[in-house]
């Protein structure tokens, strides 16, 4: 792998799967890694393994996300790379889904992504560099039965990534949305 031209990465929605694999690779490349999740206890093994720092965050709370970026900046340096990996699934038949559960799912998958991208942009634009990566799924391009809430959130996240890339790319910020299906 080519050398990564950044120093600090923040992964929001950290857990044992995709984000853990990414954290390991980034740490191996010499980046300082910040892991953010609702429950940091589940990150203790990954923190020990990679030397990453763990931060608690509710990705749907604007004040909490702003505080996360401030804390990471003060403790590790402003993140040059921000990866948004949080999502919430509410599987089931459309006619039977709890509307409030669907709303919460959308808040995590889409609104939380917006909050992360907004904070990253506020930090990166003045420097004229950085990378914002949003994890998607094939559900972001094709809905599946019994997964309406997940597809809605991933479609929205893809739209956010496309808009952010067009707005922030000319300012030196790389924005990408990539689909990863299956467990890691």
Where on the chain are the PLM-derived regions?
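The beta1-alpha1 cofactor-binding region of Rossmann-like NAD(H)/NADP(H)-dependent oxidoreductases
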Residues: 56-67, 99
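A short, exposed helix-loop element centered on a Lys and neighboring polar residues
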Residues: 117-118, 162
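Substrate-binding pocket helix/loop in short-chain dehydrogenase/reductase
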Residues: 93-94, 101-106
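Catalytic loop of short-chain dehydrogenase/reductase
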Residues: 131-156, 162, 169
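Conserved glycine-rich cofactor-binding loop
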Residues: 15-16
């Amino acid at each position: 792998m080519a050398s990564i031209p950044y120093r600090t990465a923040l992964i929001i929605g950290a857990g044992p799967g995709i984000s853990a694999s990414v954290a390991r690779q980034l740490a191996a490349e010499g980046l300082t890694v910040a892991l953010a999740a609702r429950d940091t206890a589940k990150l203790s093994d990954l923190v020990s393994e990679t030397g990453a720092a763990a931060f608690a965050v509710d990705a749907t709370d604007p004040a909490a996300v702003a505080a996360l970026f401030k804390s990471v900046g003060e403790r590790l340096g402003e993140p040059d790379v921000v990866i948004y990996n949080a999502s919430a699934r509410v599987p089931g038949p459309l006619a039977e889904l709890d509307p409030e559960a669907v709303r919460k799912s959308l808040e995590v998958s889409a609104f939380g992504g917006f909050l992360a991208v907004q904070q990253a942009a506020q930090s990166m634009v003045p420097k004229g560099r950085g990378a914002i990566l949003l994890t998607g799924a094939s559900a972001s391009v094709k809905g599946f039965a019994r997964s309406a809430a997940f597809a809605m959130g991933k479609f929205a996240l893809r739209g956010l990534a496309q808009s952010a890339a067009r707005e922030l790319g000319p300012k030196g910020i790389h924005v990408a949305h990539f689909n990863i299906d299956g467990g890691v």
